[in-house]
Amino acid sequence: MEQMDAHQIISFIQNSKKATPVKVYLKGDLEKIDFPSDVKTFITGNAGTIFGEWAVVEPFLEANKANIEDYVIENDRRNSAIPLLDMKNINARIEPGAVIRDQVTIGDNAVIMMGASINIGSVIGDGTMIDMNVVLGGRATVGKNCHIGAGSVLAGVVEPPSAQPVVVEDNVVVGANVVVLEGVRIGEGAVVAAGAIVTKDVAPGTVVAGIPARELKKLDAKTASKTEIMQELRQL
């Protein structure tokens, strides 16, 4: 999938059909009810479940209240512009609770952990691990064989469209609770220490830490051994 630029994302959101899907459990004299053709029904006897758009389901429930004894509605979004990514055929490990929007690219053998939030237009390279509760903003790009530590935020940019998103090159390790501001590029093989706030580009093969992040040293063997990427965790 080719990465979308900001204007393409804005157009996608503007022109998408906004959705308020609902799931309704209902019981009553359901055999007397004619269900709308654009509502999916799973009815057995006097009880069942229906799925549909609230704009269709709401008047349906009102019109048939004489034959509906009771119902419960489940709803988790309102006028949503972007569906979630269809993950069934993604060649990666994606754990429960990750929220990944459509138009996201995920490479082979990547790992997306619980609670991660991946916004539209983001790119995650082959073998990269996105740890728990990480946020990748719109169009944020992470290269191959990286580790983005738990709770970190890589700023993405959709608005204003002139701003640039974060780019993380290959073989980068980002510690926990790091914030990388928009427009920053982290060079190949760099290490960002936990808790850092990265406000400017990071040179390849360097170690940075602090608020704001500053270069501490060039990557040495000791640091490399402590930040090793384990391929065993990426096997499917």
Swiss-Prot record:
For this protein, the record's Pfam families field holds: DapH_N, Hexapep, Hexapep_2
Pathway recorded for this protein: Amino-acid biosynthesis; L-lysine biosynthesis via DAP pathway; LL-2,6-diaminopimelate from (S)-tetrahydrodipicolinate (acetylase route): step 1/3
> Looking at its record, which EC class is this enzyme?
transferase
Q: Which reaction does it catalyse?
A: (S)-2,3,4,5-tetrahydrodipicolinate + acetyl-CoA + H2O = L-2-acetamido-6-oxoheptanedioate + CoA
- List the PROSITE patterns hit by this protein, alphabetically: HEXAPEP_TRANSFERASES (PS00101)
Q: Mind listing the GO molecular function terms for this protein?
A: tetrahydrodipicolinate N-acetyltransferase activity
**Manganese keyword on record:** no
Question: What EC number(s) are associated with this protein in UniProt?
Answer: 2.3.1.89
Query: What is one GO biological process annotated to this record?
Result: diaminopimelate biosynthetic process
Q: Which Gene3D superfamilies match?
A: Hexapeptide repeat proteins, Malonyl-CoA ACP transacylase, ACP-binding
The answer to whether UniProt assigns keyword Transferase to this entry is: yes
Any idea which UniProt keywords this protein has? Acyltransferase, Amino-acid biosynthesis, Diaminopimelate biosynthesis, Lysine biosynthesis, Repeat, Transferase
Fetch the NCBIfam families from UniProt: DapD_Ac
Which purpose does this protein serve, as stated in its record? Catalyzes the transfer of an acetyl group from acetyl-CoA to tetrahydrodipicolinate.
Family listed: Belongs to the transferase hexapeptide repeat family. DapH subfamily.
Kindly provide the name given to this protein in its UniProt entry: 2,3,4,5-tetrahydropyridine-2,6-dicarboxylate N-acetyltransferase
